[in-house]
């Protein structure tokens, strides 16, 4: 097990993570994520195995980044853990949630949200709107913001913090 403690970061592709784990010399990688995306986690494991890495999928249910399976990954001698589905999460006091090298790969849902917004925006009676969302849709927040501002709305959003890494992000925990 590599003893170096890594800062926690969000990545947008497994290729970005592969670059870093290759640079660090990691050999065994744990993968964790929520039940709804287990098939995708298996796909990621296969990608890693094709590159020569040993993988272990942690099959226990995961309900968010506040439930990192770092201890399970360590017991399985993993050098790092890829947590798929959520963004980085810290304790309110700012301490890291884990002692293992954790990579966060948010899962992005591919549903078309803009067509719904374009079709129904004129039903919104308020002039000032709060733009919020869950991790799976936050990659489209800027597009929604721009659209609404072009239509004359004032759009506000929450700030990032210890628990959220994207403006307007809402957590389930």
Residue ranges and their predicted role:
Residues 1-173:
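An N-terminal assembly and electron-transfer interface module characteristic of large anaerobic redox
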């Amino acid at each position: 097990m590599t003893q170096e403690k890594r800062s926690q970061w969000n990545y947008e592709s497994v290729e970005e993570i592969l670059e870093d784990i290759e640079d660090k010399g990691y050999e065994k990688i744990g993968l964790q994520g929520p039940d709804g995306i287990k098939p995708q986690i298996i796909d990621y494991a296969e990608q890693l195995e094709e590159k020569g890495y040993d993988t272990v999928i942690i099959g226990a249910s995961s309900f968010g980044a506040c439930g990192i399976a770092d201890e399970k990954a360590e017991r399985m001698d993993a050098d790092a853990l890829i947590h798929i589905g959520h963004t980085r999460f810290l304790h309110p006091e700012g301490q890291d949630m884990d002692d293992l090298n954790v990579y966060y790969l948010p899962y992005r849902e591919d549903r078309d949200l803009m067509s719904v917004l374009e079709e129904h925006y004129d039903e919104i009676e308020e002039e000032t709107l709060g733009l919020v969302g869950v991790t799976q849709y936050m990659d489209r927040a800027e597009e929604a913001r721009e659209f609404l501002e072009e239509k004359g709305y004032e759009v506000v959003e929450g700030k990032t913090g210890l628990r959220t890494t994207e403006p307007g992000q809402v957590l389930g925990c």
